[in-house]
Every structure is written in C-alpha cells, then in structure tokens.
Curated annotation (Swiss-Prot):
Name this protein carries in UniProt: Ribonuclease 8
Chain positions recorded as substrate binding sites: 65-69, 90
Organism: Miopithecus talapoin
GO molecular function, one term: nucleic acid binding
The enzyme's E.C. designation: 3.1.27.-
Organism taxonomic ancestry: Eukaryota, Metazoa, Chordata, Craniata, Vertebrata
Chief location of this protein within or outside the cell: secreted
Subcellular localization, as worded in the UniProt entry: Secreted
Signal sequence segment: 1-27
Active site (record annotation): 42, 149
Pfam families the record matches: RnaseA
PANTHER family membership: RIBONUCLEASE, RIBONUCLEASE 8
Length: 154
C-alpha cells in the first residue's frame, strides 16, 4: 500500500489563509493616526446620507465596507467617553469605554455594488456605544486618551 500523499491543496490553502490574514478589516491609511482614522470613519456631527458618507471612506480603502456606524456628535464628545470607567472590549483588552447614555447614530449596511459604486441602506437609532481608547499619537488632539476603534453599539 502506498503512503498517503498530502498533495498541493493543503499548502495552497495555508498560503491563501496567510495572505487573507494580512489584509486588515479596516486598513488605516498610512498618513493618519488611529484616532484620525476613527474620526474619518465614525464621527459625523451632522447626519449625512450613507451613500455620500461611505464614499468618503471608500476613497481611502478602495473597496465597499460591509458595515459602518456614524456617531452624530463632535469628536470632543466622543473623546470625553474615553474618560468613563474602563471596560473589556470584544477582544478582551481593557481599554474600552461606554458612552454615558444613548447617542444619535446612523448604521450604514452594504446592500449591493462594487467599488466605487457601493450601495447602502441606512438605519437611524439612539443607542449607547463602546469605543476603544489609547493615548494620543503625534498629530492627535491633546486629550489624555483618544478614541481609536468603535467596538460596539449597545
């Protein structure tokens, strides 16, 4: 009886898996800090239609983002959320903070299309949110902590 051969498929799958793992879900542009990218993706004091708001994000990442949430408050208010008590994030890090109450927000969900013609449905709601916060980097506002990731809408 001949020994079993692994063949090329497991190696190919491994290489493809490694390639996919290198592509972040929401790749930050190189010329922005994490906080600046957070602001671009999620802070929208005056509500705007998903089509135009998501077009602004797509021009940086050059693909249609599946889901995005916009917080309708100034960056300074979101940064204030970073001063609330630390809680665990979805990834179990302890640098998350929950907003003090429900806030106006818009969720944009991809329905069809390919970049640059992405189509979204929008959902408006008032809900608390959780953000991950880190110390500011050079070029960030001078808050003790700045938001860098929208972890969850509660």
């Amino acid at each position: 009886m001949a020994p079993a051969r692994a063949g090329c498929c497991p190696l190919l799958l491994l290489l493809l898996g490694l390639r996919v793992a290198q592509i972040p879900v929401s790749a930050k542009p190189k010329d922005m800090t994490s906080s600046q990218w957070f602001k671009t993706q999620h802070v929208q004091p005056s509500p705007e239609a998903c089509y135009s708001a998501m077009s602004n994000i797509s021009k940086y990442i050059e693909w249609c983002k599946d889901l995005n949430t916009f917080l309708h408050e100034p960056f300074s208010s979101v940064a204030t959320t970073c001063q609330t008590p630390n809680i665990a994030c979805k990834n179990r890090h302890k640098n998350c903070h929950q907003s003090s109450g429900p806030m106006s927000l818009t969720m944009c969900e991809l329905t069809s299309g390919k970049y640059p013609n992405c189509r979204y449905k929008e959902k408006h709601l008032n809900a608390p949110y959780i953000v991950a916060c880190d110390p500011p980097q050079q070029g960030d506002p001078g808050y003790p902590l700045v938001p860098v990731h929208l972890d969850k809408v509660v």
